[in-house]
């Protein structure tokens, strides 16, 4: 079934109003509405001063390990994304309980080595030095003065609090506790035989899993027994198993997760006491036990327990490489190089380490050294393909296209199935073939364009975006009018000469302000340009619709980025960022004199109907809803809530499928993990639209021909919105909430951490489908402000470029209208790849 867009009846409610009319208000800390409001507030504040960071998270300073570099910060935007903050809370009444606290911390690390959340130690006023030993056992320990254990109900800054006691030790995995989302979970108090009995209420010395949004914050419980019965969630006794039950030397049941020694005489002996004694270790023995554990380990814990290496020791080379990979993942490439440089000195027989060292040196822009170590890594047949792929990338970064092609070919000779080498071979072969083709236009008549130019199976959004940027300046978006400079290529003297030969240099759009995608030591963000080269750009320089793309909780070092940012703003004649959230964040990093140069320039994909006459007419729509999810940096996106997210999405899809066919829009192959997980875990199969295989026109046609897009990627919302299609954002990154705040539609977003995600998403989606003309009209109305801001900025930019207005004059182009329905037989079928069932 297909439909045409049509004009809604006067007085029709917008989808935002319709969708939210019956949605009950939730705790403000976790709702997307509050998140977007926070984005709006920061945007408004940034008009006259830099927006301030929210109050420091409880872990920010007090819990940082002494070895942490002061320049490293975790970007905390939980108020925007709704990401859950989890903490353990332990009340220590006196110094006599400190050994119990230490045993608890050791047991937690040894049984859950991949888990590291804040541990808030509540105490009545013990001296700071009392916690020195505990600090050595956990990198995120936060002592906090409290009047009693009940203060665990009052821990501001956290959504979920797991209250433990010094009388407990952890014997198993606690993932189930982390996944709890409602009420206060506890094991009922024990009866005379020690077995939990619901009639005995909740003991004050047992485990509690507290969801703080369910509590009355004005009057939280004064003790466990005061928890309202309606909030209680019973836990199986294995999560708080009483050692008193193990009389006559009974063994501890194998499934016990938390063993509680409350009221157990210290003179007792037996298997339970032996289980606890296993965690009475000195620091050296404990560190050795943790490092010897198999499987995944949390990066914070591994760094905390492994470093510094004991003086005179020779740490295992695999451990050194693991630590270097952690530093690399956090952008601390200098620390990784320092570790690996010592380890591989005089050791050409360590290919994996040489590969990692080469990649880290490349991230520091120490390209000659990087090439040497990567070549050493190619000596191993096992690592040669990966090393050759990195060498191809390195040579490409330096403009050595023939060398890059040769390295990629060598990698394919080592392993003909290596996808990375095959992609580099295809890219560089095309570049070599096109190298002799010169545009008809002289350089002085061209614009230089610095951006990410996706190829092959890369992100579909990064394919559409550069063309949209160019459409703002010229009707011809091809190589005759534009000189393409990939942002990741090093701008050397020859590159600088090419840029300066152009009429102007346009940088953007996209999330270029991101430290860990193609890191380099020259700028600290995605444009690989040294400060001294940037200072010698003489062509007019415009930063256009760029985004501050740092993830919630992402750690990075700001100094190099901030210095490059200041140089960029100083040099730019125009500096426009794609949302007010980015404007506020970037202004925070600038001196006062430069802040007002930062202005708002929406992403041009959001105004596609005004840029492309082909999109200005009526849209003919199928009865489909498209969903998109993203999986890069999944830990930062989902935290502990991925299973919850998947289950809630399954419920929403079942509900929405009653009104429309639900299909999946993959912007890149990795996005298809969602349909695989959905089928495996919940038995649902979705047809897949592989957007990464489509042309830009086909991508826009697909998004224009559906009735609703539910997207997690930024451009899975902005591209359909720009084509006039209603959207709902799955908020896992601040940029989605920032965009919704800009268009004053915060309720078009639902956090991936939302407890009632499935119900909220289904309700909002069905409201859009029920009154689709009103939803489309609301999208068109929201676009007007974005187009007005874009037109005003383009007027300024025409003064820089000297180019004519591609839209026919200084006045605003007329808004596209929503026409009356037309027969389905008249519609122009979009060209697209047929959906694939997964």
PLM features per residue range, with description:
Residues 76-90, 97-103, 115, 121-123, ...:
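A glycosyltransferase accessory/donor-loop signature
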Residues 312, 346, 380-381, 414:
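Structural marker of alpha-solenoid helical repeat scaffolds
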Residues 426-838:
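Active-site anion-handling motifs in enzyme catalytic cores
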Residues 329, 363-364, 397-398, 427-431:
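Register position in tetratricopeptide repeats
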Residues 145-192:
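GT-A fold catalytic core of metal-dependent nucleotide-sugar glycosyltransferases
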């Amino acid at each position: 079934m297909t439909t045409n867009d049509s004009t809604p009846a006067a007085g029709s409610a917008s989808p935002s109003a319709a969708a939210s009319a019956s949605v009950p208000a939730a705790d403000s800390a976790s709702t997307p509405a509050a998140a977007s409001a926070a984005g709006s507030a920061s945007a408004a504040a940034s008009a006259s001063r830099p927006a301030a960071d929210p109050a420091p998270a409880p872990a920010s300073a007090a819990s940082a390990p002494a070895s942490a570099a002061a320049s490293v910060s975790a970007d905390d935007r939980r108020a925007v994304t709704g990401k859950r903050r989890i903490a353990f809370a332990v009340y220590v009444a006196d110094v006599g309980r400190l050994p119990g606290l230490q045993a608890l911390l050791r047991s937690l690390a040894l049984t859950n080595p991949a888990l590291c959340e804040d541990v808030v130690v509540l105490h009545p006023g013990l001296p700071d030095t009392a916690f020195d030993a505990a600090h050595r056992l956990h990198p995120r320990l936060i002592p906090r003065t409290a009047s009693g254990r009940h203060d665990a109900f009052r821990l501001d800054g956290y959504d979920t609090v797991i209250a433990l006691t010094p009388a407990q030790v952890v014997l198993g995995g606690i993932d189930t506790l982390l996944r709890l989302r409602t009420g206060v979970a506890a094991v009922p108090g024990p009866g005379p035989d020690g077995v939990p009995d619901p009639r005995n209420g909740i003991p004050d010395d047992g485990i509690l899993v507290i969801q703080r949004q369910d509590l009355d914050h004005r009057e939280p419980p004064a003790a466990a027994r005061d928890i309202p019965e309606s909030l209680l969630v019973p836990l199986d006794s294995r999560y708080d198993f009483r050692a008193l039950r193990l009389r006559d030397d009974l063994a501890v049941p194998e499934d016990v997760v938390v063993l509680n020694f409350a009221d157990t005489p210290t003179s007792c002996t037996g298997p339970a006491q032996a289980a606890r004694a296993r965690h009475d270790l000195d620091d050296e023995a404990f560190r050795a036990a943790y490092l010897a554990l198999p499987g995944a380990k949390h990066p914070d814990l591994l760094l905390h327990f492994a470093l510094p290496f004991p003086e005179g020791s020779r740490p295992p080379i695999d451990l050194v490489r693991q630590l270097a990979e952690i530093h690399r993942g956090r952008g601390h490439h200098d620390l990784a190089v320092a570790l690996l440089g010592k380890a591989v000195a005089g050791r050409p027989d360590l290919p994996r380490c040489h590969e990692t060292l080469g990649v880290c040196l490349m991230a520091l822009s120490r390209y000659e050294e990087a090439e040497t170590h990567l070549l050493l890594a190619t000596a191993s047949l096992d690592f040669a393909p990966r090393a050759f792929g990195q060498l191809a990338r390195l040579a490409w970064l330096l403009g050595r296209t023939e060398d890059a092609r040769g390295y990629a070919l060598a990698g394919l000779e080592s392993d003909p199935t290596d996808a990375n080498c095959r992609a580099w071979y295809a890219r560089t072969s095309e570049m070599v073939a096109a190298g002799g083709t010169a545009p008809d236009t002289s350089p002085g008549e061209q614009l230089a364009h610095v951006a990410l130019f996706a190829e092959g199976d890369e992100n579909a959004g990064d394919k559409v975006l550069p063309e949209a940027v160019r459409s703002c300046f010229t009707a011809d978006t091809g190589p005759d009018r534009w000189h393409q400079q990939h942002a990741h290529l090093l701008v050397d003297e020859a590159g600088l000469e090419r840029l300066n030969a152009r009429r102007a240099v346009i940088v953007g759009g996209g999330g270029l302000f991101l430290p860990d995608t193609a890191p380099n030591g020259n700028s600290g963000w995605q444009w690989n340009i040294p400060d001294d080269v940037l200072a010698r750009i003489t062509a007019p320089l415009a930063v256009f619709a760029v985004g501050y793309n740092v993830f919630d909780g992402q750690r990075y070092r700001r100094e190099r980025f901030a210095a490059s940012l200041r140089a960029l703003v100083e040099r730019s004649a125009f500096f426009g960022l794609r949302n007010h959230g980015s404007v506020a964040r970037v202004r925070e990093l600038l001196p006062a004199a430069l802040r007002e140069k930062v202005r708002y320039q929406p992403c041009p994909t959001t105004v596609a109907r005004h840029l492309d006459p082909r999109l200005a007419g009526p849209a003919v729509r199928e009865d489909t809803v498209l969903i998109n999810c993203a999986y890069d940096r999944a830990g930062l996106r989902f935290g502990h809530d991925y299973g919850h997210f998947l289950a809630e999405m399954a419920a929403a899809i079942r509900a929405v499928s009653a009104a429309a066919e639900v299909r999946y829009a993959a912007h890149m192959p990795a996005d298809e993990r969602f349909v695989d997980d959905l089928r495996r875990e919940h038995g649902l199969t979705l047809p897949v639209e592989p957007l990464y295989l489509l042309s830009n026109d086909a991508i826009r046609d697909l998004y224009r021909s559906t009735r609703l897009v539910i997207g997690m990627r930024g451009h899975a919302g902005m591209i359909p919105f720009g084509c006039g299609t209603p959207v709902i954002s799955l908020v896992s990154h601040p940029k989605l909430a920032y965009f919704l705040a800009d268009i004053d539609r915060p309720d078009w977003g639902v956090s991936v951490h939302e407890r009632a995600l499935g119900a909220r998403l289904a309700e909002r989606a069905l409201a859009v489908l029920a009154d689709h003309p009103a939803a489309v009209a609301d999208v068109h109305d929201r676009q007007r402000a974005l187009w007005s801001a874009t037109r005003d900025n383009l007027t300024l930019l025409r003064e820089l470029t000297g180019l004519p207005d591609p839209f026919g004059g200084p006045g605003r182009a007329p808004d596209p209208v929503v026409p009356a329905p037309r027969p389905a037989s008249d519609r122009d079928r979009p060209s697209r790849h047929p959906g694939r069932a997964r």
